[in-house]
């Protein structure tokens, strides 16, 4: 079964107001067996508009990723984030099929 990911691009406009959101997330993510794959870090934006923070959060599967986002706990916490940051967030299903390097040229 393919894993799933939240991919977020974040521009925090109120650091102090954002802190309670960040502090509440570990308990929520633990409940849904999520883990950070990317959490900030150095980045380059060769195309499109950049934001100052980028995150990728991994979930066991797509249904779990959606359930976490829709959970009452996250929805309550989301209001804090929305008041203190501009965010683009997508939920995507991963791919666990064959890779190009797995094919043998004939």
Segments (PLM) and residue ranges:
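Short S/T/G/P-rich N-terminal loop/turn motif that feeds into the first structured element of a domain
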Residues: 1-53, 60-70, 93-106
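C-terminal structural segments of small proteins and small subunits
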Residues: 75-92
């Amino acid at each position: 079964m393919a894993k799933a990911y939240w991919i977020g691009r974040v521009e925090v406009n109120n650091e102090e107001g954002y802190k309670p959101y960040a502090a509440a997330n570990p308990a929520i993510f633990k409940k849904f067996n999520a883990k950070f794959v990317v959490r900030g870090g150095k980045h380059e934006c060769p195309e499109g508009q950049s934001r100052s923070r980028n995150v990728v959060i991994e979930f066991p599967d797509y249904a779990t990723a959606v359930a976490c986002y829709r959970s009452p706990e996250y929805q309550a916490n989301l209001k804090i984030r929305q008041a203190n940051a501009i965010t683009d967030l997508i939920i995507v299903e991963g791919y666990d099929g064959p890779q190009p390097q797995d094919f043998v040229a004939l």
